[in-house]
Amino acid sequence: SEIRDKFNKKIFGKKVLLIGVSYREDTNDTRYSPAEGVFDFFKKMKCKTSFYDPIVNYWDFTDSYSIEKKDLDNFDVYVYLIKHQSFKKLNIPYKKKSLILDLNHVLERNKRLRISNSKNYKST
């Protein structure tokens, strides 16, 4: 995978947050969600992976609950997966060395530019 090849050393064993795990935006349906494959990828990389989704409280694929909004600032890698409307107003205080991966163009242009200036942002 492109992510593994480019960021292997940066992500191995890190704390990862998947942002948006439903199958489609603005729904709580997680059946056939692409987030499952992403979760499995980070599991193979020995990462401690959590998720945040204001619409999906419980994700049966991982048998876990979404973290709370107040706990978004404690991760090494942030992976944006689904473009929920509520994410337009989401402001995460990223750590200086955090890696931000936007796999579905979730972040709006002005946020992408602000984050990309920190040199830790990757959009695919």
Locate each region found by the language model.
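Structural/interface elements that position substrates and couple domains in central-metabolism enzymes
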Residues: 1-124
